[in-house]
């Protein structure tokens, strides 16, 4: 058929992008399909295609992996995925494309899009599907695209027919001869109906050609040679691709999972379409070029695109690959994977695609896929007059960029250097080069970033830094989205390695008030940093202090006392030195005591009030002789009051009083303490010295204490510490001393009963007499307090004395009778309703129930009628009801 007729047939095909159709027609006209030899060659190859097509029912297996892979085997390795810059509209035309009039949704091929490369390697999945599509029992494929008869699929060859001399395993790409033959077979004929035309259309897979090649070919291209001569010169052609500035290179192999070392992914082709077209002389008028294409612009960077294989472009953004803008209205699901070393935007191992990021100046040197030096530049179509970094970078010769971006490093965010680049043009981390070896197996063994059944998360690109920052916080990291500590890190991952070492989390809840659960919180937590630094400094200081103490303690490990003779005093106030001397006293006994006594006797008062020295004095007082102890007593006696009031000295002085064995020593102590007895009795530390004197001295020696207390009885008895001294006097004093003291106290019993501390003195008198079975002062106390029984019973401290009397069997009945006779029903009712009196009433009921039924009956008759109303619901009311057995 003629090329003109073929062009008319293509124009009749519905849903065909005009740009693509013109491009295909131009290519077919260049190939001179009218030639009989061409038809014979194409038909022969087409027959082979039709024979092999029965084994490939649907698209190749690499496009739709076996369902089991999505479940148990993890997600598709990211190096096998395609990175396609997208736009929120259905088919994602790039914003900078030259032809703004190109259709957006009607062209599944996205013919107006920028050139894109696709990695279509079938090797990783041939083991699972063997090149055939997954089918049901009836032979019908599960995938609707596979069932589409209009999608005529070429067979998957074990070796690429184009690269027979390169010894490179073939990929899923098909040679141009196969494509041409299949295209001619699939085109509608004159006799077919319109619906058959639509069903017979298929998308073709072409090798990477620049838009300039296709546009020039579409504008009345004239061939300088016939097709037969061109076919003979295909293998000999060495001229560059069409266009002075274009150098086409075709991908021949992708990453392989087997142990075969992978060769370069981009190598100069031996039988590429660019070489086939290199011998063609293009003569296109400038006017036609202006009329049929977009307005002429200056020369733009060389870019290369591949047709979308077997189903058009990706219909959704790829959320895993960086640089894909997402719809801003998409749900905010994109959080960092919790798995370590997982593939994601901020992980250690980054995804890779042959389509490099638009900001890359050339094939990235850090790509994990081994590449030879390639001049291919991948970038959006920019204004050549623009001063942006990306454009000026691509105009450098030899593929060696000299922009500031290269000086800063491959991971610097481009839009921070040059504002002409938008936020969607952000670079991403790339693994170091693999040095022409297959990627390590662990590269594909990490867990998927999301479960198999969870849909990919859509998130606007400009939200990624915020999300990464928030996710860092969700993992216990208080990091900022931007940090001056990592100037070369990618935005959103700037503080990924800056993990918190401290445990402070100050301001966590405060920050959450200003954001949605911390997802978009970029506030700086300076408090955390300060606290972490403080904690670190404190830890270092503590460690240094512990180390110093260990060294000091080890200093005396093997030491002997003779080494420190003459400098013992310097060891007494040191913790380890003091312990060393005490140990020497235990080992050497009197010998060590003599040496220590001679060097420390002049510093006795100083050591007795020292936090460490007082322990040495206490140990020394036990080891020295009586003469030496008397010397120490005489030396320290003028300072007994000062020593007694000191928290450390009081212990040393008490030890000295315990060690007294002679009257001389006792007299020295008595003479020193007598003037200060009342003062010491009321002191927190001094009262223990007075009590120790009552315990260790003879009655005649501590008589000075009874004399001082008798003169200041009310002052000492109503004091917090003095009342304790007075009780010790009742314990250690003689009968005469105690009776004299009790007479003094009995005259003050009314005041003492109502005093917070004095009431304990009155109770102690009753207790001591009960122990001695002598109740002289007890009866006297009851006799004095009975007329005020009801008044004292409702008093906070007086009620304690009344209860003590009721619990004393010898005087309990007289007190109960006093309550019944003098108080009567009114007095008992006041006790029942009082917070303190109810305890007195409960005690009276309990004691009378055990000892005197008559008194119990009388109390019951008075109390029972009063237990009505709210009183029954009170805790004490319920207890009284239980005691009277009124709850039944």
From Swiss-Prot:
<dbReference type="GO" id="GO:0008104">
    <property type="term" value="P:protein localization"/>
</dbReference>
<keyword id="KW-0805">Transcription regulation</keyword>
<feature type="compositionally biased region" description="Polar residues">
    <location>
        <begin position="243"/>
        <end position="270"/>
    </location>
</feature>
<keyword id="KW-0804">Transcription</keyword>
<feature type="modified residue" description="Phosphothreonine">
    <location>
        <position position="205"/>
    </location>
</feature>
<feature type="modified residue" description="Phosphothreonine">
    <location>
        <position position="212"/>
    </location>
</feature>
<dbReference type="InterPro" id="IPR011989">
    <property type="entry name" value="ARM-like"/>
</dbReference>
<feature type="repeat" description="Pumilio 6">
    <location>
        <begin position="744"/>
        <end position="783"/>
    </location>
</feature>
<keyword id="KW-0597">Phosphoprotein</keyword>
<feature type="region of interest" description="Disordered">
    <location>
        <begin position="467"/>
        <end position="551"/>
    </location>
</feature>
<feature type="repeat" description="Pumilio 4">
    <location>
        <begin position="672"/>
        <end position="707"/>
    </location>
</feature>
<feature type="compositionally biased region" description="Low complexity">
    <location>
        <begin position="478"/>
        <end position="499"/>
    </location>
</feature>
<dbReference type="InterPro" id="IPR001313">
    <property type="entry name" value="Pumilio_RNA-bd_rpt"/>
</dbReference>
<feature type="repeat" description="Pumilio 1">
    <location>
        <begin position="563"/>
        <end position="598"/>
    </location>
</feature>
<dbReference type="InterPro" id="IPR033712">
    <property type="entry name" value="Pumilio_RNA-bd"/>
</dbReference>
<feature type="repeat" description="Pumilio 2">
    <location>
        <begin position="599"/>
        <end position="634"/>
    </location>
</feature>
<feature type="repeat" description="Pumilio 5">
    <location>
        <begin position="708"/>
        <end position="743"/>
    </location>
</feature>
<feature type="modified residue" description="Phosphoserine">
    <location>
        <position position="256"/>
    </location>
</feature>
<dbReference type="GO" id="GO:0003729">
    <property type="term" value="F:mRNA binding"/>
</dbReference>
<dbReference type="InterPro" id="IPR033133">
    <property type="entry name" value="PUM-HD"/>
</dbReference>
<dbReference type="Pfam" id="PF00806">
    <property type="entry name" value="PUF"/>
</dbReference>
<comment type="function">
    <text>Is not essential for haploid growth, but may affect diploid formation.</text>
</comment>
<dbReference type="GO" id="GO:0000288">
    <property type="term" value="P:nuclear-transcribed mRNA catabolic process, deadenylation-dependent decay"/>
</dbReference>
<dbReference type="GO" id="GO:0010608">
    <property type="term" value="P:post-transcriptional regulation of gene expression"/>
</dbReference>
<feature type="modified residue" description="Phosphothreonine">
    <location>
        <position position="252"/>
    </location>
</feature>
<feature type="domain" description="PUM-HD">
    <location>
        <begin position="539"/>
        <end position="888"/>
    </location>
</feature>
<dbReference type="GO" id="GO:0005737">
    <property type="term" value="C:cytoplasm"/>
</dbReference>
<protein>
    <recommendedName>
        <fullName>Pumilio homology domain family member 4</fullName>
    </recommendedName>
</protein>
<keyword id="KW-0677">Repeat</keyword>
<feature type="repeat" description="Pumilio 3">
    <location>
        <begin position="635"/>
        <end position="671"/>
    </location>
</feature>
<feature type="region of interest" description="Disordered">
    <location>
        <begin position="236"/>
        <end position="270"/>
    </location>
</feature>
<dbReference type="GO" id="GO:0017148">
    <property type="term" value="P:negative regulation of translation"/>
</dbReference>
<dbReference type="InterPro" id="IPR016024">
    <property type="entry name" value="ARM-type_fold"/>
</dbReference>
<feature type="compositionally biased region" description="Low complexity">
    <location>
        <begin position="521"/>
        <end position="543"/>
    </location>
</feature>
<feature type="repeat" description="Pumilio 8">
    <location>
        <begin position="823"/>
        <end position="861"/>
    </location>
</feature>
<feature type="repeat" description="Pumilio 7">
    <location>
        <begin position="784"/>
        <end position="821"/>
    </location>
</feature>
